[in-house]
């Protein structure tokens, strides 16, 4: 009997020990694999879940004045739920999977607040002959630095063209590198193939006889048109806009256009961008552009698209101002999971393109170039006042100091007549402006979205011809804005600059031209301000700062993973930092 009790007690002790042992083992291994597995890197974030990310510099971009770091962050599904220490993250989220950055740097996903998918879709699958090489998914485009180089590449392209009936579109021509071209010259290149040479600015084009015939463009429709040179086959600014509907069937040809959008998506991911916006939708045709964009976005690429309506283009289509306004106010009905129209925001256009030397500059040009208006000033003022009274945020394309000054007068006048405290009117591009204009921007409560790449691409040539050294070497003076705490973002206006936020940041930080000329070094930005311009300040440009642009609790889990910390890496090499991948809405997408 005693023996039986003894055995029973032994069994109980053994059972109790076994239970405690296996419970301890379970907790130990669960903790080990949940929080300490050194092999779990960002590659493991394959689906929305609960994760703690640590093990490398995490730069939240939430501090407006200086850099700060977090040791760890926690995300749940597509939202950030914690920022702070690793121990506290584990304590609050005991079941989260731990992700080790392995020394790589985490930043908010880059935001590109001004890009045109339609331009990308047209340019990328067609022939690029530009002054500089372009990095494309299928390799580098061939650069042409002179007239002879340009004509040689164009002639070879024509020789290899697949069909006499198919239009040959080529983008990238610029007269300061490639010399003068004309309808007659293009006829000599080919009298049988329709040729459309789109200028580097995408604000003008040259056509040969075959193209003019194919598109049924009539001379009688352009008699005395100030922005058409019929003899040269040259259509620019409003003249170019006038023929776009005639070209639209070919420009929006679905197979080629969708190939271009797919290439754009690849470039966006490769460069760490998780959000893009197009100010000025549509460019050509609302229904067709939206349908093709939806087709691309149904593939669920790792970025979101925000659209800002094009006031003038829609007014032409809708015929009346009130009908246009009703349509604009209904646009959110077209929203999808990853395409959204920004409510109560509108895009207007002021002067001509900086790449065409058509921007309006107060001192004029020192060559034969002349400033142009994309929108006649009286009509621009009328549109501005109307949408100001309707309490829209206005985004306005403005390149030269004369155009910027005109718009600031409109802001001042409108705000006195219909006061608005936080209007945040945003001037886009701002190729050339002065310190005094920056002061006015500050005092009037306006903001900026700028393209610093103009300096790299144009400073040397525009010093030689057009602007002279004083103006050409002071293009896009970003530090004038930073010193005044004016919100400003960087954008590519693709393809006016590479679709690469780090390239834009590097240009603003270093202010070195394509010939390695150091210019206006007092206008260099510090690295933190440059990063703000592609993250939190870019979110503010779009009024999305409560959702995107920084690593803060409640915001979207959109991040970029870099192989180097841009705040400590050598400034001259920032554009060479590798984008390892992005986290978009809580899922990691690798570039490797």
Where are these regions (language model features)?
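N-terminal secretory signal peptides that target proteins for export/translocation
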Residues: 1-17
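Non-cysteine beta-strand/loop elements that form the S-adenosyl-L-methionine
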Residues: 339-358, 446-456
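Phosphate/diphosphate-binding loops
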Residues: 301-346, 424-435, 461-487
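Bacterial N-terminal signal peptides
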Residues: 20-31
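Boundary at the C-terminal end of the N-terminal hydrophobic targeting segment
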Residues: 34-36
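Acidic (Asp/Glu)-rich catalytic clusters
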Residues: 296-298, 331-338, 418-420, 441-445
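Divalent metal-binding segments
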Residues: 39-40, 44-54, 60, 65-324, ...
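His/Asp/Glu-enriched, well-ordered alpha-helical/loop segment
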Residues: 259, 385-395, 399-425, 429-430, ...
């Amino acid at each position: 009997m005693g023996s039986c009790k003894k055995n029973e007690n032994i069994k109980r002790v053994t059972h109790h020990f076994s239970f405690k042992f296996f419970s301890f083992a379970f907790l130990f291994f669960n903790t080990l694999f949940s929080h300490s597995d050194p092999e779990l890197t960002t590659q493991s974030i394959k689906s929305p879940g609960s994760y703690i990310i640590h093990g490398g510099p995490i730069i939240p971009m939430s501090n407006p004045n200086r850099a700060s770091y977090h040791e760890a962050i926690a995300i749940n599904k597509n939202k950030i739920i914690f920022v702070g220490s690793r121990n506290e993250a584990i304590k609050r989220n005991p079941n989260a999977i731990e992700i080790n950055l392995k020394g790589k740097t985490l930043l908010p996903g880059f935001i590109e607040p001004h890009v045109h998918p339609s331009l990308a879709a047209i340019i990328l699958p067609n022939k690029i002959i530009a002054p500089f090489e372009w990095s494309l998914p299928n390799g580098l485009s061939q650069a042409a630095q002179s007239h002879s180089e340009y004509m040689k590449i164009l002639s070879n392209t024509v020789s290899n063209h697949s069909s006499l009936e198919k239009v040959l579109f080529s983008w990238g021509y610029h007269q300061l590198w490639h010399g003068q071209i004309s309808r007659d010259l293009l006829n000599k290149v080919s009298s049988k193939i329709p040729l459309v040479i789109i200028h580097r600015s995408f604000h003008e084009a040259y056509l040969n006889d075959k193209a003019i015939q194919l598109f049924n463009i009539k001379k009688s429709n352009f008699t005395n048109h100030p922005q058409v040179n019929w003899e040269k086959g040259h259509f620019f600014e409003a003249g170019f806009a006038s023929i776009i509907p005639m070209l639209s069937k070919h420009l929006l040809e679905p197979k080629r256009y969708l190939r271009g959008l797919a290439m754009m998506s690849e470039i966006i991911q490769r460069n760490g961008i998780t959000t893009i916006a197009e100010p000025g939708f549509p460019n050509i045709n609302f229904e067709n552009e939206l349908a093709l964009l939806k087709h691309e976005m149904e593939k669920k690429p790792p970025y979101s698209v925000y659209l800002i309506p094009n006031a003038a283009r829609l007014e032409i289509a809708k015929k009346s101002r009130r009908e246009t306004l009703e349509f604009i106010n209904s646009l959110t009905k077209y929203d999808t999971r990853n395409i959204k129209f920004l409510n109560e925001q509108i895009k207007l256009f002021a002067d001509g393109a900086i790449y065409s030397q058509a921007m309006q500059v107060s001192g004029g040009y020192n060559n034969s170039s002349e400033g142009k208006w994309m929108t006649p000033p009286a009509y621009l003022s009328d549109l501005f006042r109307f949408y100001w009274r309707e309490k829209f945020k206005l985004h306005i394309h403005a390149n030269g100091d004369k155009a910027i000054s005109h718009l600031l007068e409109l802001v001042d006048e409108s705000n006195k007549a219909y006061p608005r405290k936080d209007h945040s009117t945003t001037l886009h591009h701002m190729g050339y402006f002065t310190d005094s204009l920056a002061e006015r921007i500050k005092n009037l409560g306006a903001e900026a979205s700028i393209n610093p790449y103009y300096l790299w691409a144009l400073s040397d040539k525009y010093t030689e011809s057009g602007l002279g050294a004083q103006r050409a070497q002071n293009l896009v003076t970003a530090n004038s804005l930073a010193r005044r705490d004016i919100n400003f973002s960087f954008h590519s206006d693709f393809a006016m600059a590479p679709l690469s936020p780090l390239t834009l940041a590097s240009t603003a930080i270093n202010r070195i031209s394509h010939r390695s000329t150091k210019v206006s070094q007092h206008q260099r930005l510090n690295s933190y301000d440059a990063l703000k311009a592609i993250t939190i300040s870019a979110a503010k440009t779009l009024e999305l700062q409560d959702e995107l642009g920084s690593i803060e609790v409640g915001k979207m889990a959109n991040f970029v993973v870099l192989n180097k910390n841009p705040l400590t890496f050598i400034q001259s090499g920032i554009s060479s930092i590798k984008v390892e991948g992005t986290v978009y809405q809580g899922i990691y997408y690798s570039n490797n």
